[in-house]
Amino acid sequence: MRLAHVSLIARDAPALAEFYCTALGCSPRRSATRLSGAWVGRGIGLPGAEILSIWLNLPDSGAPFLEIQQFALNPGHPPPQPDTPGLRHLAFATADIEATARAILAAGGSQQGEITDLGSAEHPCRALYMRDPEGNLIELEQA
């Protein structure tokens, strides 16, 4: 068994996909696809669902991939906080945490915290929490 993909639900899937490509080096895996019909509703347990689905390759990886979905009818929810139960964040390893943070800010993201060392004396690991334009948490790690 292996992890196949991670999915984010977006208010604007094309814009969020562009952010991940620009700021973090993701690349399109396939063309954007519209999913609808009874089979989609049965599959995800939401009758009448209409979804725009975008798949992105993560940097330096063929799998797993990042899926960004936009539902036609989405009531919206506040962005998750660092202590919210459930999926907390996407973490990206980077050789230059400051440069990656600048790229995220330039592409429309925001900074959540400050750079800190979450590692040990033997294995330092600089980390920084950021947010994408829709408020999803991103952790940057530089080991």
Each PLM stretch: what is its role?
Residues H77-P79:
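Short beta-strand/turn micro-motifs at beta-sheet edges
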Residues M1, G48-A49, A121-H123:
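Short solvent-exposed loop/turn micro-motifs enriched in small/polar/acidic residues
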Residues L3, P85-H89:
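Eukaryotic phosphotyrosine signaling hubs
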Residues I9-G62, A99:
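Core segments of cupin and vicinal oxygen chelate
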Residues A32-S36, F71-L73, T116:
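Generic short beta-strand segments
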Residues L8, R30-S31, P64-E67, F92-A143:
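Vicinal oxygen chelate
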Residues P59, Q69-L73, A143:
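Generic beta-structure capping elements
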